[in-house]
Amino acid sequence: MFLYALRRLLLAIPLLIGITFISFLVIHLAPGTPGEIQTGDLSIQSDKEIQKLLIELYDLDKPLHVQYWKWLTRIVRLDFGKSFSPDARPVLQKIGERLPITLLLNVVEMLIIVALAVPIGVYSATRQYSMFDKVTTVFVFVGFATPDFWLALLLMILFGVQLGWLPISGLRSLNWEYLSFWRQQWDFAGHLLLPILVATFGGLAGFSRYMRQSMLEVVRQDYIQSARAKGLPERVVIGKHALRNAMLPIVTVLGLSLPGLIGGSIIVESIFAIPGMGQLMVQAVFERDYPVIMGNLVIVSTLTLVANLLADVTYSFVDPRIRVGARRGRR
C-alpha cells in the first residue's frame, strides 16, 4: 500500500507540471495585460510609458517559456510571488486568508450531501418504483437542470429580500463586533446557510442517484439473494451486506467530485460576496493578476490530486479485492 501511494505521488508530479504549464499558456494568451488593466485598458488617457515600465517590472517582456521556468523555480521554493494588484501583497498571504472559508464551505457541503444522499439512495433502491422513488427521481432531474446562479438569485429574493429571514451577502453583519459570542456564531452560520444550500442542491441530486444505482446493482447479486434465502432479516441484508459494497463506487465519486465542488464555489462565492478562493480567483482573472491565478490553480490542483489519491487508498481499505490484486501484481 505504501509503495502504491508513493507511486501515485510520483506520477502526480508531472501531471501537476502539465496542468500548470497549460494553464500558464492559456492565461498569458488571453487578451489584456496587467499593465493595461492598471492604466485604463489602453484608453486615450493611458500612459504608454507606465505600461512599458509595468511590463518590464513583471518580466512580461520575456518569452513565455522563460516566464514559466522562472515561475516554476520559485514555486519549488514555495515562493508564489507577489500579487500584481496595487497592494502587491504576497500571493500565499492572500490565499491563506481565503482558503479556510472555501474549505469550510466544501467540507460542510460534502458532509451534508453524504449524510442525505446515502439514506435517500438506499431507500429509493430498496423501494424501487414507489412514490418515494418517483419523487426523488423528479428531484434529481430538477437538481441537474437548475443552474446554481439562478437558484441563488431565487433564494436571495425569497429569504433575503421578501421575507428578510437571512442575509444575502458577506460573512458578517455590520454590527457583528457589538454582538455577544453566541450571537456572532449564529450570525456567521446565518450568512453561510444560503450559500451551502445552493451548493448542496445539485450535488445531493447527483450523489443520491449514484447511491441508488449502486445499491440496485448490489441487491441483485447472488450473495444478497443467498443471504435472504437463509432467512436473514432485511435490515441485516441491506445494512450489513449490501450497503458496504454499494458504498465502494461512492468513495471514488467523492474523490473525483472535488474539482466540481471548488468550481461551484466560484459561482456561489461570487454571487454571495463571500471572501473565499472562488471570489479571489474571479477578481484575479479580471485584473490579469497572473501570480494569484497560478497560485489558486496550484492549490486547487494539488487538493484535487491528493483527494483522488485518498479516494484510491480508501477504496483499497474498504475493498479487500484491491489489496489482493495488488499483491498478485507484485508477484
Predicted ranges, named:
Residues 2-3, 95, 99-132, 161, ...:
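Alpha-helical transmembrane segments of integral membrane proteins
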Residues 6-15:
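N-terminal signal-anchor/signal peptide hydrophobic helix marking the start
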Residues 9, 50, 54, 64-80, ...:
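Hydrophobic alpha-helical segments of integral membrane proteins
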Residues 12, 98, 102, 138-145, ...:
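Residue-level signal for discrete positions within transmembrane alpha-helices
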Residues 16-69, 163-184:
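Hydrophobic alpha-helical transmembrane segments of membrane transport/permease proteins
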Residues 22-29, 58, 73, 139-169, ...:
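Membrane-water interface segments at the C-terminal ends of transmembrane alpha-helices
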Residues 44-61, 137-146, 194-199, 236-253:
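Hydrophobic alpha-helical transmembrane segments
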Residues 60-118:
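An internal, D/E-rich "acidic patch" concept
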